[in-house]
Regions:
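Conserved, charged catalytic cores of large soluble enzymes
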Residues: 77-115, 135, 139-155
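Short, charged/polar, low-complexity loop and linker segments
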Residues: 53-58, 109-117
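Secondary-structure capping and boundary motifs in well-ordered enzyme cores
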Residues: 20, 31-32, 61-72, 100-108, ...
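Basic, alpha-helical terminal appendages of large translation-related enzymes
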Residues: 117, 122-123, 132-221
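Short hydrophobic "helix-edge" motifs at membrane interfaces and signal-peptide entry regions
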Residues: 26-27, 111-113, 170-172
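Short acidic/histidine-centered micro-motifs embedded in hydrophobic/aromatic stretches
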Residues: 8-9, 46, 130, 134, ...
Length: 221
């Protein structure tokens, strides 16, 4: 397997270039003692200085962890998994897709070319931002379709919404894998698929139980 080393610009900590010898910033091991490795990878990749020096603070790293990983991505996975497990004994694809479902799945299908091109150009910060934009799209889809309300009157439609969201979550895990491989694998291994595209939209199996998944990330106080 090929390894790629990227020589980048400098990361600044409180206006100074990070330097272990001068005591500016923390060592990697000091961060790993406190952080989920994937959360640390995300925080650092979000601040990658590709064209010019960039400044990063621990407060900003914590904010990204809490707001983007815990509240946006982790919460998305948890609420879809929980709603499927609590309301259906197995993954169901019952109702036909409607326009809002088709729109999300089309966007997820197109996401691979968009993010892939950014990665090929080594625009990793932009690729990560774009990947998280799709997480926001799935959250927006759920907020618009409100399956927790729909299920009270139309169980088949609620099942379709959650199935569509699960397909999109699987794609989000694919997009985020280059940046957060461990947690992405946790998500992907919990979702049963009919297809095994690592970089493409997958068809999710129906009639089977969804595996349990724990919290992906912990919130910093």
């Amino acid at each position: 397997q090929r390894q790629m080393c990227i020589r980048d610009r400098y990361i600044l900590v409180k206006g100074e270039k990070a330097s272990a010898s001068r005591g500016v910033g923390k060592t990697l091991q000091e961060y790993l003692d406190q952080w989920n490795p994937d959360a640390l990878r995300y925080a650092l990749a979000s601040a990658l200085p590709e064209q010019s020096d960039t400044e990063i603070s621990e407060d900003e790293m914590i904010r990204r962890n809490n707001e983007e990983l815990v509240a946006a991505w982790g919460n998305l996975v948890q609420r879809v998994f929980t709603q499927i497990q609590n309301n259906f004994s197995k993954i169901s694809e019952i109702d036909e897709t409607v326009e809002v479902d088709k729109k999300l799945l089309k966007e997820m299908s197109e996401s691979y070319d968009i993010v892939g091109q950014l990665i090929e150009k080594v625009e990793l910060k932009a690729a990560l931002q774009e990947s998280m934009r799709y997480v926001s799209k799935v959250n927006g889809y759920l907020n618009e379709t409100e399956p927790w309300k729909v299920i009270k009157e139309d169980e088949k439609r609620a099942a379709r919404i959650l199935y569509t969201a699960l397909e999109a979550i699987d794609s989000c895990a694919n997009l985020l894998y280059p940046f957060m491989p461990s947690t992405s694998d946790l998500v992907r291994s919990a979702i049963p698929r009919e297809t095994e595209n690592l970089w493409g939209l997958n068809k999710i199996k129906t009639g089977v139980e969804l595996k349990e998944i724990g919290l992906l990330f912990n919130k910093f106080d």
